[in-house]
């Protein structure tokens, strides 16, 4: 990782948090097998996350996962009829705990939204 971390004010990740951690190119071979057997990836505002993932893979000369993305913004709007569909509001409406922009909390909330949409889908 490089010492300049964008959006620290949003996600709270600092240089001290990552200075001795692997960069994406080193981490991907460890992370990619976790996706084996997955049918899809889920993200809140999936087009953004897909762009970041594909951009990182391209930068490091890696093959991105060949998986469709499901967007919990769209699921919240279309299946759960929640508006506005930003993460904090969807969590509030569904009664989900959220420490917004803390990566694990955001990921867990996203998974819970996807599960709620699956349960509610006709």
Predicted regions and their residues:
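Ser/Thr-centric signal marking residues that sit
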Residues: 8, 72, 110
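Acidic two-metal-ion nuclease catalytic site recognized across multiple nuclease folds
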Residues: 111-122
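Conserved beta-strand -> loop -> alpha-helix junction used to position metal-binding or nucleic-acid-contacting
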Residues: 63-76
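Conserved non-catalytic scaffold segment of RNase H-like nuclease domains
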Residues: 1-66, 81-84, 88-101
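Conserved catalytic/binding loops enriched for acidic/polar residues
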Residues: 106
């Amino acid at each position: 990782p490089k010492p300049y971390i964008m959006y620290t004010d949003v996600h709270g990740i600092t240089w001290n948090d990552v200075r001795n951690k692997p960069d994406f190119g080193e981490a991907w071979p460890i992370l990619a097998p976790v996706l084996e057997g997955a049918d899809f990836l889920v993200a809140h505002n999936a087009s953004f996350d897909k762009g970041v993932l594909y951009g990182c893979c391209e930068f490091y000369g890696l093959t991105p996962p060949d998986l469709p993305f499901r967007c919990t913004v769209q699921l919240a709007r279309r299946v759960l009829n929640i508006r506005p569909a930003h993460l904090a509001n969807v969590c509030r409406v569904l009664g989900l705990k959220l420490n917004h922009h803390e990566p694990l909390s955001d990921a867990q909330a996203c998974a819970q939204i996807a599960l709620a949409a699956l349960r509610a889908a006709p």
